[in-house]
């Protein structure tokens, strides 16, 4: 008989209350910051917009969460909900594409990697979209491209501005040329926005790479980024292996890109609503933001 069993028989109550208290603690109550490794109380993190209160690191968040933080509460219309991805090429790598889609849809409760909502910002109507990075790395396939174009079309029809929060690894390789075509398709749609004189603000969050960074994400009238976001085309390890040189400190971080003129401004998540409203107010002729808003 082990010592632990012997103690449990003599003092059974010593162990049971501890187990009971442990079982009463809900899962996910604490979260570890990936930057400072501090442990943060989940409700506190929620109140702080998923920004670490210890080091100000902007944690990755879902598309729905991001749009909820950005748009006014109230009536919202989702665009492109009837669109679902199709495995036209019967693509298979280590896993069938259709199986990857099923797994991603189950994990995220989304049909694909872009959510588009028509809503309001401080009472002014606009269209906003956000990439869901947890859906196959936020990769852009046919559905993502079509939803984005439909968002643009709504803006053109109703004379509204467009805001896009990008978080993507790039074009979806499982759709091959169908995916690459979305780069041209979304870029052409944004040219129509430009010709119509309607503003498009691109917000680059962590991370934005590949075909998304090489198309719609960098085509904003104003390109905004969250602090410390990774932004580029190829990843830093790939670049280092190609050029056989050590990259500068902070290479591809939003602060580095701002310093070298690749983006226009860095905005904290806490200030995103007010900052983007003021930008759009100047472009759209909206009324100035009231002090109590």
Swiss-Prot record:
Its EC number is 2.1.3.15. It is found in: Cytoplasm. It catalyses: N(6)-carboxybiotinyl-L-lysyl-[protein] + acetyl-CoA = N(6)-biotinyl-L-lysyl-[protein] + malonyl-CoA. Pathway: Lipid metabolism; malonyl-CoA biosynthesis; malonyl-CoA from acetyl-CoA: step 1/1. InterPro entries: AcCoA_carboxyl_beta, Acetyl_CoA_COase_Trfase_b_su, ClpP/crotonase-like_dom_sf, COA_CT_N, Znf-ACC. It holds the Pfam family Zn_ribbon_ACC. It comes from the Bacteria. Acetyl-CoA carboxylase is a heterohexamer composed of biotin carboxyl carrier protein (AccB), biotin carboxylase (AccC) and two subunits each of ACCase subunit alpha (AccA) and ACCase subunit beta (AccD). Belongs to the AccD/PCCB family. Zn(2+) binds at residues 33, 36, 52, 55. The gene is accD. Residues 29-293 form the CoA carboxyltransferase N-terminal domain. Keywords: ATP-binding, Cytoplasm, Fatty acid biosynthesis, Fatty acid metabolism, Lipid biosynthesis, Lipid metabolism, Metal-binding, Nucleotide-binding, Transferase, Zinc, Zinc-finger. Component of the acetyl coenzyme A carboxylase (ACC) complex. Biotin carboxylase (BC) catalyzes the carboxylation of biotin on its carrier protein (BCCP) and then the CO(2) group is transferred by the transcarboxylase to acetyl-CoA to form malonyl-CoA. Transmembrane segments: none annotated. Binds 1 zinc ion per subunit. This is Acetyl-coenzyme A carboxylase carboxyl transferase subunit beta. Its cofactor is Zn(2+). GO terms for molecular function: acetyl-CoA carboxylase activity; ATP binding; carboxyl- or carbamoyltransferase activity; zinc ion binding. A zinc finger (C4-type) spans 33-55.
